[in-house]
Regions:
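NTP-dependent nucleotidyl-transfer catalytic core
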Residues: 1-360
Length: 360
């Protein structure tokens, strides 16, 4: 009942409690490994508990995905590959890549400047890399991908170097299409997050708080604004997403409210406010423009800057795609918003006495 009501929060509390108690009772770690092996072996009781935990987790995370507007074509988790690991392990064995080390099975990567990759524990249980190998083969055989991107924190750099090298050593050249898109860690208001220590900030709580704070700002600045709840949702969620994507992905970032929700600066709300201003101008322009304007009269530096940034946008998007670096787009968008606002404040727009302003 506590898990059903508490969802991911309750499961996290169990996780923290387990590791705290394991510090004084090492036998818990052994019991945990035993139950993990039971899951891999398809034990009925273990699978019932595992499936229940998974359903509770997916139910909670789906609310976050809905808030972010994110959807997935496949929700295949680690357990999906339980019955797909044996053929991969057998191929490693047939190709002479598996060696025994203290009862465990490893792939020796010393020649490539990496420690051995542990494939099977002494009790036969698998590890992350075993499941990732099975997943890689499944994805290649199912999707025949040109690129397979792993968006995972930079702490896993070694893991993915080992993964890709093992697939290469197995003789499969499609490893060349696999890439680890690493990213930095996030701290909250100056404090590092740690699940094991129990200091976590749930994304759903963060997004809801962002919407709440955005609503307060809107009430203060624009009390007569229609659809305040929807605008608050867009501004709040947008602020969190933009804050994350505005930084180079490999840099650690410290999330702070006063920066994320600032309407003046390199933030989501600033860009959204600028977009709203542009839309307002365009609505007024529909009624104002009686004839096709003469664009050749747009010669001032401010307008030229805006036009240049707009023209460069497709190249920026392509470069961001090639380098898997979304901050290129957010930074360019910020620059465009700044350039537009500079033009907006320094020039008259839709003024019949100023053809350049009307054309712009």
């Amino acid at each position: 009942e506590q898990v059903e009501q508490g969802g991911v929060n309750a499961l996290t509390e169990l996780y923290v409690r387990f590791h705290k108690e394991a510090e004084t009772d090492p036998a818990l770690e052994d019991e945990g490994r035993l139950w993990f092996k039971k899951i891999e072996d398809g034990d009925k009781e273990a699978m019932e508990i595992f499936t229940w935990f998974k359903e509770v987790t997916l139910k909670d995370t789906q609310r976050v995905y809905d808030l972010l507007g994110v959807s997935f074509d496949s929700y295949a988790g680690e357990s999906f590959y339980n019955d797909k690991m044996a053929p991969v392990v057998e191929e490693l064995r047939e190709k002479g890549l598996l060696i025994e080390s203290q009862g465990a099975q490893v792939v020796d990567l010393e020649a490539y400047g990496m420690p051995p990759a542990l494939i099977l524990r002494s009790d036969g249980a698998t590890l992350y890399i075993t499941r990732d190998l099975a997943a890689a083969f499944y994805r290649h055989n199912t999707y025949h991908f040109d690129k397979c991107l792993y968006v995972v924190a930079y702490q896993q750099n070694l893991h993915f170097k080992q993964l890709f090298k093992i697939i290469e050593l197995m003789g499969h050249d499609w490893y060349k299409g696999m890439e680890h898109v690493s990213f930095g860690m996030v701290s909250y208001e100056g404090r590092a997050l740690s699940t094991r220590e129990g200091y976590v900030v749930y994304l759903e709580d963060l997004l809801n708080k962002a919407v709440e704070k955005a609503r307060e700002i809107i009430e203060e600045k624009s009390p007569n604004l229609p659809n305040k709840d929807e605008v608050a949702r867009q501004v709040g969620v947008g602020a969190v997403v933009y804050f994350d994507l505005h930084n180079d992905r490999n840099k650690d970032i410290d999330f702070r409210w006063e920066r994320a929700l600032n309407f003046d600066g390199e933030t989501g709300p600033y860009v959204q406010y600028t977009h709203a201003r542009c839309c307002s101008v365009l609505r007024k322009a529909e009624a104002f423009a009686a004839a096709e304007p003469d664009y050749s009269v747009i010669t001032d530096d401010e307008a030229q800057d805006v036009l240049m940034l707009i023209s460069h946008f497709p190249q920026v998007v392509r470069k961001a795609m090639e380098q898997s670096e979304p901050s290129m787009i957010t930074r360019h968008t910020t620059q465009l918003a700044q350039a537009y606002n500079k033009y907006y404040f320094e020039h008259r727009i839709m003024d019949e006495s100023d053809p350049a302003g009307t054309a712009a």
